[in-house]
Swiss-Prot record:
In the N-terminal section; belongs to the ATPase B chain family. In the C-terminal section; belongs to the ATPase delta chain family. GO terms for cellular component: plasma membrane; proton-transporting ATP synthase complex. HAMAP family: ATP_synth_b_bprime, ATP_synth_delta_bact. It is found in: Cell membrane. Residues 1-168 are annotated as: ATP synthase subunit b. The gene is atpFH. Residues 169-443 are annotated as: ATP synthase subunit delta. Its main location: membrane. It is a single-pass membrane protein. One of its GO terms (molecular function) is proton-transporting ATP synthase activity, rotational mechanism. It comes from Mycobacterium sp. (strain KMS). This is ATP synthase subunit b-delta.
Amino acid sequence: MSTFIGQLIGFAVIVFLLVRFVVPPVRRMMTAQQETVRRQLEESSTAANKVAQADQQHAKAVEEAKADARRVVDEARSDAEKIAEQMRAQADAEVERIKVQGQAQVQLLRQQLIRELRSHLGTESVARARELVRDHVSDDDNRSATVDRFLDELDAMAPSDAALDDAVGSRMRSTSRESLKALVSRFDELTADVDADGLTSLGDELAAVAKLLKTEPVLGKHFGEPTEDGEGKANLAEAVLSGKISDTALEVVKAAVAQRWSDESDLDYAVRHTARLALLVRAERNDETSEVEDQLFRFSRILDSESRLSGVLSDYTTPVDGRIGLLDRLLGDQAGETTRALLAQTVELLRGERADEAVRELAELAVARRGEVVAHVNAAAELSDAQRTRLAEVLGRIYGRPASLQLHIDPDMLGGLTIAVGDEVIDGSLASRLASAETQLPD
């Protein structure tokens, strides 16, 4: 019994201890565990909701993606159709362009071929015509007949007078031309009784005055000023030149500076002109005018054919003694004393002009002194005496003055004549007519 009571008390103590010290922690642990389980259940429920929402969003995104894909496909299909339509339109346009361009190219090639055929045919025709003409004029009578036909045509021109400018004064204005005529008239008066030697000295003195005007430009400017005080300038010339040149030369210079000139260079030209006249008058006094004219024209033709020689003689920047020495060697014994003096004076007094032009002008001046015009005639062969006479007579009627013929032979002319009088050219050669026909061929 006592054992039972002891055990009961022990059991009660154990129960007390359990209730007092074990049950509260256990209860708290259970409560905490329950809270944890509850929270986990809530979190699980929340997660499940999120998963459900995610599934819904995924499904929605999938639907949207499918819709976008369908839209992209539709847009791509529409763009493809538009691009295909544009490409078809471009292809049609390109085909049309190539077609039109091809037609234009064919037309161009056709026209070009036609032009080439026409040109070739025209060239061949002209070449054949040239051969026929050359064969025809190889006979002297036929070639002479072409000259006669040209003279017949020229004869028809004779009633219409041609205005021929004075070769000497053509480069001047009217005032200077009148002054030059007055100076030449005064020169003729002063040299009426001067002998050949005096004329030679006069030419040298006037050439020296011309060189003085070049080396003393201030003096030349004062003498050439277009003023009314001609007497004052003449007195100045006398003061400067008296005792240094002859009285005749001084009077010529005074007459020159007393005139009114349009330009200062005209006075220089006038003095050089009188220097040439002195030697030409000397040729007249010595009855060698024709010889001098012929020699001048022959030398002029040499310069025309030798451009390098003309260039050397024209180069006034080189020493004049060297150029005159070259001139003397060229002339040798083929020219008279007067011709040599005229050519040397011309070369010495060049002012930038070409030697060939200056010599040609000198030769024409020699002819003009006799009241004639110079006709430079080019022919394929020598003219007969009758043709020369008729040509001179026809030109004399056209220009109102006797004509001096200067004939140049050029076989390439084939036939007919080419005549140059001053600046007027009458071209009646067969070669020029064939050339004209060739230039008129279609391009």
